[in-house]
Amino acid sequence: MSTLTAPVPLTEPELKLLQTLVYQECGMYFDERRTHFLRDRLQRRLKACQIDSFYSYYRLLTSREGKQELVALLENLTVNETSFFRIRPQLELFQKSVLEELLRRKQERRDWSLRIWSAGCSTGQEPYTLAILICDALAYYYLRNPLPFDMPTPKPLIPPPWKVEIIASDINYSALLTAQQGIYTESQMETVDYTCRLRYFDKVGDKYAVKPALKNLVQFDFHNLKTEYLPQRNDAIFCRNVMIYFDEAEQKRLIEKFHRCLNPDGYLFVGHAESLFGLTTRYHMIHQNNATVYQRLEAAQ
């Protein structure tokens, strides 16, 4: 090893080896349009490890001792672009249509549990947004449909006997740590209005911390979507702007996994620019007000 001052040369066969390893580990596919990004991230890790040859680094990645470095590489390949209340038309569809239907259906069955999975949660803004939307939706729902008993004092965010569980997962440990801390800067809070800040956040210096009552609704965990061990019995899954990093074969496998992870008639939200068209017939597409959600079907149509 030596102190690196110049990029390590990388041949096409070496790049192909790295592409294959990344694909096998997490399903991310780097086509010709994204090889520059892959090369750049590889050079960063070579410099960080002070390794001056690709094959030395590859041997490290594939060794038992290199598991931590493999995690570091995969973290560098993920893009943690997220914000509170991102893609508002989808969130309005979730709150005003999907949640309304779920609450009505579950109350009829005396099923008081609600389970949502945020797959690819990054630094936590999406699952905390979902928690806020659910709390607001439950409050509004019971203004119009009173509970058959008195509400406890002080009023909890989630009225009993409801139990809300939001599973938030990512492959990036650093992003998960930020999400678990639940502390955000003023610029990260730009899309959160004043009333919402007062109700769900505490001001800590020049930052904002998610209030414990809201934070307790979200459980953060490491999950690799390539594996079969994924959260089950979900009423809705949010996996937005994740499948764009997968090839068609991996997209189809992931969509099938989500089908198994959803409750009957559960809902799948994907990115605004993503679609299940041509990938599966096991979901019914619902489109309202420039937003789309896919509802699980019980059998191929």
Predicted regions and their residues:
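A structural alpha-helix within SAM-dependent methyltransferase catalytic domains
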Residues: Q95, A131-C135, H259
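Core SAM-dependent methyltransferase catalytic element
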Residues: A236, F277-Q301
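Conserved AdoMet
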Residues: S2-W117
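Residue-level signal for inorganic ion chemistry
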Residues: F94, I237, L262
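Extended basic-aromatic, gly/pro-enriched interface segments that bind polyanionic ligands
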Residues: A119, Y140-F238, V242-R253, S275-F277
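Conserved SAM-binding loop of SAM-dependent methyltransferases across substrates and taxa
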Residues: T123-R144
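Conserved beta-strand signature within the Rossmann-like core of class I S-adenosyl-L-methionine
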Residues: P264-H272
